Structure formats: C-alpha cells, structure tokens
Amino acid sequence: MLSKKMLRDIAKHKTQFLSIFLMAFLGVFVFAGVGGESVGLEVNVNEYYDATNLADGWIYSANLDDDFVDKVNNLNPTKDRERQLVMDSVADFSNDPQITLHFLEKNNISTFYLIDGEEFNVSDENGVWLDKKFADSKDLKVGDNISFTFNGIEIEKEIKGLGYSPEYVYHASDASVIPDFNKIGFAYLSYKAFPLSDVPYNVLLVDFDGNAGDYDDLLSDKLDGKYNSFIQQSEHVSVSQFSEEMDQHKMMGDIFPVVFILIALLILLTTMTRIISHQRTQIGILKAVGFKNRTIMFHYISYGLWLVVAGSILGLIVGPLTLPNLFYPSMSSTYILPEWKPAWSMTFVYVAIAMILMSVVVSYFAVRSISKENPADTIRPKSPKVSSSGFIEKLGFWKKLSFNARWNYRDAKRNKFRGLMTIVGVIGCTALLVSAFGMYDGMSNLKEWEYSQINHYDSKLVIDEKASLSEIDDVAHEVNGDKIMESAIEIDSGNSKKSASLLVLNDTKLVTPTDYDWNKVHIADDEVSISQKMADL
C-alpha cells in the first residue's frame, strides 16, 4: 500500500523529483566522467612510461666521455645508463620545421615506441625513426627519404619507422605553448648515422634506485664540476607539463560535482519538507491505524533514496563511458599518447554511496519532527509560524517598500531554509559561470602577457656553439636583432636543488621581464631575477 502511495506522490510532484534524480545523476556523472578521464590519463601515461622505460633522470654535459659514464655507472643506485647526442636540426621543407635529432648509443631507456614500420635498430646507419605526428602532418610514410641540416651539415635518411617517444608526450616550440606538429618534431637515429667519426654525446640517460633528490646529491658529491646539470624525471618539461594537466583535471573533477550534489540534496530536503507538511493528515491516519513510526519514516526516506540510487547508478555507468571521449580529442591535439582510454576507480563508488547516505540523512531530518507527534496532533493542520517584526521592519525605509517587496521578505523570513537554498543555488551557478569565463579571460591575458608585454620579437635564431663573437655580431647586425644567452643551469638554495633555464639579456628592447602586475622589472648588473614559481619551489 505504501509503495503505491509513494508512486502516486512521485507522479504528483514529478517535477521536483525529476530534479532530484537529474541532480543526483549529474553529480555522479560529472565526478565519475571527469574522474574516469583523469584516472585514465594517469593509467595511460604510466603504462606508456613503463612500456618505454622512461629515464629516471638526465645528465647534461658537453663532454660525456667513457670515463665519466663509468663513474656514473659505478654509483650504487645506478641500474642502467646510456648516452645520446641530442641536437636541433631543420628538415628540408618549405616551412623549415625544427626537428630534434637523437643519436642513440643504445635503446634501453626512453625507448622509441613504434607505431608503423620496423623496430629501432641501433646498428642501422641509413635509417631514421620519425615522430609520427610530424610525419602525418607532412604526409610522410615508411620508405620515404627525409633530409636534415645541422651545423652546416646535411644528412638524408630513409624512414624506417614512425612512432612516439615518452620524452615527447608534450612537445612545443619555445615561441608557443600549443604544439604545431607541422613545425616541430623529433627523430631517432643510430650513433652510426652521425656523419663524423667522434660522436659528441651531450645527454646521459640514467635509471636508478631510490629517491631522485638523493641521487642528485650523490652526483654533486662524487662528480661535482664534471657535468652541467641533472634533471630528474618529475622536472622534465614533458613529464611536468602533463602531470600539471592531470592535476588540473582532478581538481576540476572534484569541485564541479559538489555543486550538483549540494543542489540535489537541497532540492530533496525542501521537496520532502513540503510533501510531509501537506500530508500531515495522511501521516496521522497511518499512525492511527497502527503503522509504526519506523515504517512511516522509512516510507518517506525511500522517496529520495530510490531516486538518488537510480541517478547515482546511471551516473556511474554513463559518466566514464561518455565524458572522457569528449575531452580526449582536444587533449590528443596537444599531448601524444599511444592510447586514450578511460579508467575506473573505486572512488566513484564511494562518492555515489556517500551521496546516497546523505540523501537518507536529509530525508530523515525532513520527517523526524512529525514522527515524534502523537496521531491526534498529526491529524490536525499545523499552526502557521508566527513571524515577529525584525529590525529591518523598524527602519524608516520599510514603509516605502512596495507590498510585493514586503511580502517576499516576510515569506523568506518564515521559510528561511527555502531562502537559503535559493541563495546557495544562485551562488553555485554563478560560480560556475564566473569560473568558465574567468578561465577563458585568463588564457587570453596569458597570451597577451607572454607575446605582447614580455616578448616583442617575431623569431629567434639559434647560433652554432662554435661561432665566434665577431660572427655572432655579424649575424645580429644582418637580421637587425639583439644577442641573448640561454642555458640550462642548476639552482642550489641550500635546502633544495632545482634545474632551471638561464636567460642573460643585454640592453635589448625585444625582451622585457615583468612582474605579476605587468610592471617592468629592472635588473642591475649585480642582481638576478628569478620567476615566482622558482622562488616558491
């Protein structure tokens, strides 16, 4: 009998109960959907790193001779190491794309992830294994030839394979934060493909046991002055950028569902309070004919319970199957992973269970007061609340308000919770709108700040390291440019060490360092300026 009554009540108040179902569904749908996307990113990238054995760290030096490599290998935590020569080149296309060449001594660490063609062969001096994203943008395929120019030397190789690299999950040029795969790429070659007899290796990839910070300290202690810098895995540009992206998605997935869940619970509380108030007589009759308070309470608690259970289950199923597929196409245009698939986490179930339990608690608070009344009092209509005059009604402007304004104020005063729900709902919706537009404005301001306020140049030329000062002056005069120096450095604050980029400026107007308020930062000859993020680290 009570089940039929519940169904009739739900049909009678279908709009309110539909809202409860939809809010419960949306809350779990967004949490499980965005969570499935962010957890999927983490699972996919970790599987990718494991499959390719991403390096634990990179040691940079201008001279990685056999003696230095042996000393690194003899350090107790070191499990494996291999040298590479990493250098910039220009591919033979009309837009002069920049291709980072990797000449490999071995291929055991940060290995090439093959998509098409044959596996990387360290003994093959005629082949090149090319970035698939770049190859697709240029309509290149396995078997085609491609030419690269570096340091005045041109080499032509046959494309033996197309694929990805774990070091290039994120890869953008210095002048852009959004990758343009038509202008940048990477290529893996054997050390035998290098045109000179001696390969000037400049990067040593290492796998090691233990903490990266401890390994950094050990390098500094044993090999101080024999290398330029050490970058641990978490500080690598590609790794850190993708990690920050995952953190942003996790934060978004944690915040946005809260709004829907709170609104669902508020709607449930006000709806149940209104239904119970209207059904006082029915509740009194149920008590009079022998129904226990426990039975009546469960009857009304079940109104929201089954709707929230249905919405939560549907959200758990639909969310991870649909929302990630909306994010991944845009993500794949910026980041490179061999696989994009959502993942599941028990956290989604815990949130759904928590929401169901909260709906039970909310319904309980709505029905508990009337359950304590005896049948005779429950059958009688509830006496209206007596609203006393507040301080606002004693102010002079009160009489100047219209009748509708005074009515609305007194009605909100008598139904404080309903008014609170309205305020919270408006705050939540406004916060979502402001956050969305704020994010858009923030990205627009970032672009304006980076490319109008700080950098004023159209292009940047990378000078050969062997060029003399007079040759550099001639180039600068020829292109009407200014000279700057960029280098990788290691900052030691006593408590921690961090890898950073050093930028040395002459009296140039093409680069203007600024603070957060876009004010120009003046740096004296005996001063140095560091970024706020580096200062925080």
Language-model features, listed with the residues they occupy:
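A short beta-strand structural signal in non-transmembrane regions
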Residues: 55-62, 134-135, 183-233, 242, ...
